[in-house]
Regions:
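Short secondary-structure transition/capping segments
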Residues: 122-135, 161-172, 197-207
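Alpha-helical repeat scaffolds
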Residues: 62-63, 99-111, 135-147, 168-184, ...
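Surface-exposed peri-terminal alpha-helical interaction modules
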Residues: 1-5, 108, 133
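Short, hydrophobic/aromatic alpha-helical segments in well-folded domains
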Residues: 67-68, 106-107, 123-124, 141, ...
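Amphipathic alpha-helical repeat scaffolds of TPR domains
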Residues: 32-53, 74-92, 115-130, 151-162, ...
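Intrinsic low-complexity, intrinsically disordered or marginally ordered coil/linker segments
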Residues: 4-7, 117, 151-152, 170, ...
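Helix-turn-helix repeat elements of alpha-solenoid scaffolds
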Residues: 15-21, 56-65, 95-104, 129-136, ...
């Protein structure tokens, strides 16, 4: 197997990606797919770090998304490549390409390979909240993450808090469900407190109307 992911690279070669199709790369790699994925991941880090440090002006980070796609096609369960790759893609200029939509697409690709990976759903929610200022979409993804096997108990309250800001009616419905069904006393307490706060906000809004 001969890969353009091998390191170190010469300065002229570092901006060239000979294989851009993950399917083609998988065919070339045969039984060496995990190794090839590791090599492409190393090149991804080199590419992102190099352009970030030098503040490259000529098509900065141009290979970032193709490299991440190759890496995760060669190894569909490469958790670090999905999670850190999404951070790289979403990072705003000049420190990154500022492509949150590509970051979300990468994490959604990860969910296709591992549908119950709550971390990917949580990361998508965070990108919606932090990079896209879309609290409603963030709340839906946090809620989805909280429902996945192995998700930590704190995810429910995070989703509830975000949803309260984005969609009070939906938040109230979910908070009541959480308060009634959770086996964790502290989760029920948070849900009940958020419900009380939400009701107070609605009462104030009616008085001001």
């Amino acid at each position: 197997f001969r890969s353009d992911a091998r390191v170190p690279l010469t300065q002229s070669a570092e901006r060239t990606l000979y294989v851009r199709s993950g399917i083609v790369a998988r065919g070339f790699a045969l039984s060496l797919k995990p190794l090839a994925a590791d090599l492409y991941w190393l090149r991804t880090i080199q590419h992102f770090g190099g352009d970030r440090i030098t503040r490259r002006r000529d098509r900065p980070f141009e290979l970032l998304q193709p490299l991440l796609d190759l890496t995760t096609t060669l190894d569909p369960k490469f958790v670090m490549a999905y999670r850190f790759g999404a951070i790289f893609l979403a990072e705003p200029p000049p420190g990154g390409p500022g492509r949150p939509e590509q970051a979300i697409a990468l994490l959604e690709k990860g969910l296709v390979a591992q549908p119950n990976k709550w971390q990917y759903a949580y990361d998508i929610g965070f990108i919606h909240l932090w990079n896209l200022s879309d609290a409603k979409a963030a709340a839906l993804w946090f809620k989805r993450a909280a429902s996945m096997p192995g998700a930590p108990n704190w995810l429910g309250p995070v989703a509830a808090t975000t949803m309260t800001e984005a969609d009070p009616a939906a938040a109230a419905l979910w908070l009541r469900e959480m308060a009634a069904s959770s086996s964790q006393p502290w989760v029920r307490a948070i849900a009940e407190r958020r419900l009380a706060q939400l009701q107070a906000m609605q009462d104030i809004a009616q008085l001001e109307a």
